[in-house]
């Protein structure tokens, strides 16, 4: 029987770093963000759906999605956020299910990194859920530094996600990412050894 572990957190919580450590330990990880980027690539299913919905102003000079512009258009308007979620989630869910079913054929244990795992009701897909947790202030600082956001813009982005403190009750394991990389890696390696 295959064991599937869902990995979640919030924006700038450190999920990518955790995913990297898990992969380096020999486990397969389906990364929802990478799946979305492929679907949003020129000619992809999401690319087509977004282009039909918002028109060519979401494209850059090369005909690719202008992600910052797209993000601004979606986050600036609550109706756009709802439409975007409805439009994108079914396409993303379908692709993630396909990749999950493929890995079930070859892996005893694998992970799926899904930022909105709880919000988009993926919980039943998993035997365990690992939450990458970081304090809100640290999350804000990382988001501002990583994306060059003002504090106001970073707070706006966080306000559109379920707080990490609320996600704790869904987690089988909480990975505390408030410390340094060595401490983070030790936590993950300990958890992987218990599998």
Swiss-Prot record:
Pfam short name (any one): CoaE
Assigned GO CC terms: cytoplasm
EC main group: transferase
Catalytic activity field: 3'-dephospho-CoA + ATP = ADP + CoA + H(+)
Domain DPCK: 4-195
Binding residue positions for ATP: 12-17
SUPFAM superfamilies named among the record's database cross-references: P-loop containing nucleoside triphosphate hydrolases
GO molecular function: ATP binding; dephospho-CoA kinase activity
Homology family: Belongs to the CoaE family.
NCBIfam families given in the database record: dephospho-CoA kinase
Protein name: Dephospho-CoA kinase
Species of provenance: Streptococcus agalactiae serotype V (strain ATCC BAA-611 / 2603 V/R)
């Amino acid at each position: 029987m295959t064991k599937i572990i869902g990995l979640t957190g919030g924006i700038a919580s450190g999920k990518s770093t955790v995913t990297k450590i898990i992969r380096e330990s020999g486990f397969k990880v389906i990364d929802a963000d990478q799946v979305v980027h492929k679907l949003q690539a020129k000619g992809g299913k999401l690319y087509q759906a977004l282009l039909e919905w918002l028109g060519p102003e979401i494209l850059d000079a090369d005909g690719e999605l202008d992600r910052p512009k797209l993000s601004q258009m979606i986050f600036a308007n609550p109706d756009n956020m709802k439409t975007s979620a409805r439009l994108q989630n079914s396409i993303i869910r379908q692709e993630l299910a396909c990749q999950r079913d493929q890995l079930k054929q070859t892996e005893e244990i694998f992970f799926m990194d899904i930022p909105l795992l709880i919000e988009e009701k993926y919980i039943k897909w998993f035997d365990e859920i690992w939450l990458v947790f970081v304090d809100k202030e640290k999350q804000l600082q990382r988001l501002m530094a990583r994306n060059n956001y003002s504090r106001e813009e970073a707070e706006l982005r966080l306000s559109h996600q379920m707080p990490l403190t609320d996600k704790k009750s869904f987690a089988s394991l909480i990975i505390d990412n408030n410390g340094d990389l060595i401490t983070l890696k030790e936590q993950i390696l300990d958890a992987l050894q218990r599998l």
